[in-house]
Amino acid sequence: MELNEYQKRAMDTCMLSCDNFSYMALNLVAEVGEFVGKVAKQIRKENIEIGDNRLWYRFTETDAAYACDGELMSEAGDIFWQLAGLCAVMGWDLEDIAQLNLKKLASRQERGLIDGNGDNR
């Protein structure tokens, strides 16, 4: 599926009351918080640990690991929906944003500036 197709189809599910910058921006942050909250709860329960910059499942049952992974994927989808919505209310196509980001990253990589801080590097 193309990103712009996803954006259009996702926004077909958007209620009129949600089609505004404030809702999309604030709820994007909320959805990221829900994702991180689910990870934190599983860390507290010792079902997940973070090591080598990735999540490691420590469930004793495979079904529980798949269920947790499914919940996190669902939250990632909610984050993606909110990002698509934020771009839509700004009048931006997701594909354009993705291309701009890849161009910026390629430029930084060519100049040896991938690692660092600040927008203008």
Locate each region found by the language model.
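Flexible "arm" and connector segments at domain edges
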Residues: 1-76, 80-121
